[in-house]
């Protein structure tokens, strides 16, 4: 089976031939953790993503460009230093990445951190990935113009239709396999064996939520409330609310009557953002939303439903502990009011990832996380930052995962 070489762009190639090329020693010697050859390539790639024309068309790529700036890279690498002379850190070797098709820029984060850790990488880009992924591949290939030859010799991105034989070939050669996707696809890939020393790093289905403090909302300025609506819009609508960190349920915490007033205002402000951004939901999605929301009501999960045009639907949840974790369609928000933040705890499960918050103090949130004690929720972020990728993701410190330690205790 011939694979389409996306980066570096080249003739179609078979998996075995690609592995033979990538396992040769690169010019200038093997890559090291924090290798200058990779850093200089990543910063040049970041500049291409931050170019106004690209950032305007795909705003999500601007945050990727920001993540890969030299200062950010230095910060990430600084967290790696163990300050222990007897512990040396090295790359794992060959890392095989299988990213999801629905959030088509996530592969760049996991690839970039793995390359920064000094690994050779093979990334499968889904044939279904769309505009933003194409823009990323173009920017990567443009950045090659001034790159060290070691980049081409150690980093590959390919596209092929689902093919277990090809995936098995890459899996058998890998020292680490990184799988993003739904639970089913993670389990399918896991059936393909790895070398005995190798392991998987999995990012399966996750659910995320948003929480607003009723008192915090009341105390906030009109400007801060508007900004909260814009942040919530970015968190929810950028990837059609399908990203693992986009909120699926909105909680209000505090007095129920005041919460009603807050909800009305929030819905109005969000509606204004939707109009300002020209958010258009296609007819198929509008139908999907109605089917899934009426389905939730029929199942007794929701007690009432409200549509504000096709772009915004809100549902009242019957039980604060029975949460809707599946995707109901772009711009569909089940809501529930809780008396206290601690009432959220019984509802949280291991698969719950991001909590986007507005109007709480840091101490309140640390108290919540301590009460959760690891049963779920890997990150707590302000509105507008749900989709901001970080080198610690799903509870993993990725640079640590992408490296291995050798100790010299003599």
List each language-model region with its residue ranges:
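N-terminal Rossmann-like NAD(P)+-binding subdomain of aldehyde/semialdehyde dehydrogenases
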Residues: 1-92
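Conserved NAD(P)+-binding/catalytic subdomain of aldehyde/semialdehyde dehydrogenases
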Residues: 149-256, 392-410
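Conserved small-residue-rich beta-alpha loop and adjacent elements
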Residues: 80-144
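Short hydrophobic alpha-helical runs that function as membrane-insertion/retention elements
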Residues: 121-125, 178, 356
């Amino acid at each position: 089976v011939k694979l389409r070489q996306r980066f570096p762009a080249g003739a179609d190639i078979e998996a075995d031939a690609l592995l033979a090329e990538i396992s040769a020693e690169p010019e200038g010697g093997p890559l090291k953790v924090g290798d200058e050859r990779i850093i200089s390539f990543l910063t040049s790639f970041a500049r291409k993503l931050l170019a106004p024309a690209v950032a305007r068309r795909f705003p999500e790529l601007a945050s990727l460009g920001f993540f890969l700036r030299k200062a950010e890279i230095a910060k990430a690498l600084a967290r790696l230093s163990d300050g222990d002379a007897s512990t040396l850190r090295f790359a794992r070797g060959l890392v095989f990445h299988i990213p999801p098709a629905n959030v088509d820029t996530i592969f760049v984060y996991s690839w970039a951190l793995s390359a920064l850790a000094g690994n050779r990488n093979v990334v499968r880009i889904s044939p279904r990935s769309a505009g933003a992924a194409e823009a990323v591949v173009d920017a990567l290939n443009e950045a090659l113009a001034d790159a060290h030859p070691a980049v081409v010799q150690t980093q590959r991105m390919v596209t092929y239709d689902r093919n277990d034989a090809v995936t098995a070939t890459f899996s058998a050669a890998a020292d680490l396999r990184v799988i993003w996707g739904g639970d089913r696809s993670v389990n399918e890939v896991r059936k393909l064996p790895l070398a005995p020393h190798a392991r998987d790093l999995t990012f399966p289905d996750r659910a995320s939520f948003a929480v607003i403090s009723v008192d915090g909302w009341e105390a906030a300025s009109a400007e801060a409330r508007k900004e909260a609506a814009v942040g919530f819009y970015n968190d929810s609508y950028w990837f059609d609310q399908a990203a693992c960190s986009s909120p699926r349920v909105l909680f209000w915490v505090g007095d129920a009557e005041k919460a009603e007033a807050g909800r009305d205002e929030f819905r109005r402000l969000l509606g204004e953002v939707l109009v300002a951004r020209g958010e258009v939901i296609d007819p198929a999605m509008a139908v999907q939303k109605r089917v899934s929301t009426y389905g939730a009501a029929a199942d007794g999960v929701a007690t009432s439903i409200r549509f504000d045009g096709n772009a915004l639907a809100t549902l009242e949840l019957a039980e604060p502990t029975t949460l809707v974790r599946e995707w109901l369609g772009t711009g569909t928000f089940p809501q529930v009011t809780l008396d206290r933040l601690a009432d959220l705890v019984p509802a949280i499960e291991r698969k719950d990832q991001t909590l986007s918050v507005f109007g709480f103090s840091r101490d309140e949130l640390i108290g919540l996380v301590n009460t959760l004690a690891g049963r779920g929720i890997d990150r707590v972020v302000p509105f507008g930052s749900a989709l901001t990728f970080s080198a610690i993701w799903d509870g993993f410190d990725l640079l640590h995962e992408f490296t291995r330690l050798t100790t010299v205790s003599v």
